[in-house]
């Protein structure tokens, strides 16, 4: 169990790192912790000797990572722990005897009085397994975690692997928790991982060491006082730790029972209503808040930093003291002595890896693990070869490397695969023939495949340098030999005398021109503009209120020429100077003039062409009119050409010219009645107008007739033709 609530305080300061961080280090392992952890796995069916199986594979993993393990066995349990051991035995053997049995009421020694007889038997099996693997085991005088902490505190090992937080109370400096080599579960890791707790760093950060851990064990609970002090938790203990240093906390706790008068005076002062709870001076808190404090020299309120925080801290400590003194044996000096006591002598540990015993493992451990002999050989043989590679200078050598098969890389470490052989036949007859026959049937290489192992390259270079050098030399690629033969002098003479021999091509190297002779950029850009073809610019279109292509479909936009009806210059000239005389236009020495016409020539021509189409449709057309009539209106427009649209303009209400668009937009009548004017009236282009009247304006005014008079005007008007005379 350990110290209650201790892991919650230390976990924020731990570091999760891979197990290869422990490479080359010596670690002390609480063997009882690993065994209890394996025995508590009851959620699913496991191996009947799960603790042995788990111990074997975990130890193998440490060997592959070049970590030196030191397993510490349990000694004589302290008397303080007898109560805890009895409760554990009751939970372990529950259901064996009825609770109300008369035998239980008799004053007979129970099984719990025998101590750890059954548990020690399990530890003895584990010790036999470890000795067969050549791993060092150490017997502790008392608790295993206490001896592990002792070895770590005196520098004999680099750390402690344990799940019990009691090792911190015993003085452990570096603890490895949650050791895992599995790829499944909550503590899974790809290559093995462990939580590292370094008390040196934790003490420097929060002033939390062994003495405070002992006080926490007395107040919150531990293996020697499971219940602790009722009503005291982690938060109250941490507030007490913040008030006192690591070296003061244990003496302060011992003074709770001895210095009664001192704490009684503190209780009277803390609870005194005549003393201000903020500043600690004489006077009530309410009066100081309103009128101020004369000692603090304030007119309103008082200095809270003098007494308020200190009062709360003292009050919290007095509350813990009051609860702790309810226990008659608090503070228990036996528990404090158990955590602070150490063995008298420091042992001389021989941490060298001893030779593994394959025969002992198969004979003694194989039946406990319920493994067949060939499986035991397959799992244990790599341990023997690794020991021989590391301890190659030993005189007693059992097997020899036969050859190196190939290169390998294991977790980024360069390695080699070897095949070993047994020259003295020590392992002959160790595996039954039946198992060998079954193995050879499944593996084509036969029994020799059991003698294949993978070892690190650096270890092999130290142990067997000649074998490694020969293998690496055999893997080197020889230099490539040129297959081209050198020509002799006679062959060269014959080649020169051949008539068909082609002369050698001489490659001329072009020298780079100096920068002074290089052409400049403006010489490339300075071309003649006279003969250079230039793209004609697009005609500029003027924006107006009525776009040119507003009432025309897309295929008739090209039929209109905007420049032909551009009268902007004429309008500007009239507006800018209305009194100016118009310029006369001559043609072959004669002045041009015109006669007004009643209708638009283009409109008249369109009506005439429309009438001809309705009376006699042309036979030459190749369109199928029946199919065209069935199409929608938009499709029919797209199938007809521009001439058809011009002819059917009146029916489709389309504008054919810009003038017609202007009339349709402003609802100007297309049929204009002939105004009554003098016969000698001439165009505004000439300066012969009578009565100084603008004929163009009169023409426009007369054109604004209602739309409903259009039909009547059509019957009355006659066709007027434009006459242009020389």
UniProtKB/Swiss-Prot annotation:
Composition skew (Acidic residues), residue ranges: 708-726
Binding residues annotated for Mg(2+) 1, in chain numbering: 30, 74, 143, 145
Compositional bias (Basic and acidic residues): 488-501
SUPFAM superfamilies per the UniProt record, alphabetical: 5' to 3' exonuclease, C-terminal subdomain, PIN domain-like
pH dependence: Optimum pH is 8.
Record-level GO BP terms: DNA repair; double-strand break repair
Name by which UniProt lists this protein: Flap endonuclease GEN
Leader sequence residues: none
Function: Endonuclease which cleaves flap structures at the junction between single-stranded DNA and double-stranded DNA. Specific for 5'-overhanging flap structures in which the 5'-upstream of the flap is completely double-stranded. Prefers the blocked-flap structures similar to those occurring at replication forks, in which the 5' single-strand overhang of the flap is double-stranded. Also possesses weak 5'- to 3'-exonuclease activity on nicked but not gapped double-stranded DNA. Does not cleave bubble-like or Holliday junction substrates.
One GO cellular component term noted in the UniProt record for this chain: cytoplasm
Annotated Gene3D superfamilies: 5' to 3' exonuclease, C-terminal subdomain, 5'-nuclease
Cofactor binding annotation: Binds 2 magnesium ions per subunit. They probably participate in the reaction catalyzed by the enzyme. May bind an additional third magnesium ion after substrate binding.
Protein family per UniProt: Belongs to the XPG/RAD2 endonuclease family. GEN subfamily.
Region of interest (Disordered), ranges: 96-116, 478-521, 704-726
Region described as N-domain: spans on this chain: 1-90
Pfam families given in the database record: Chromo_2, XPG_I, XPG_N
Residue numbers of Phosphotyrosine PTMs: 439
Cofactor(s) the protein needs: Mg(2+)
InterPro entries with a match to the protein in the record: 5-3_exonuclease_C_sf, GEN_chromo, HhH2, PIN-like_dom_sf, XPG-I_dom, XPG/Rad2, XPG_DNA_repair_N
Annotated stretches, region: I-domain: 131-227
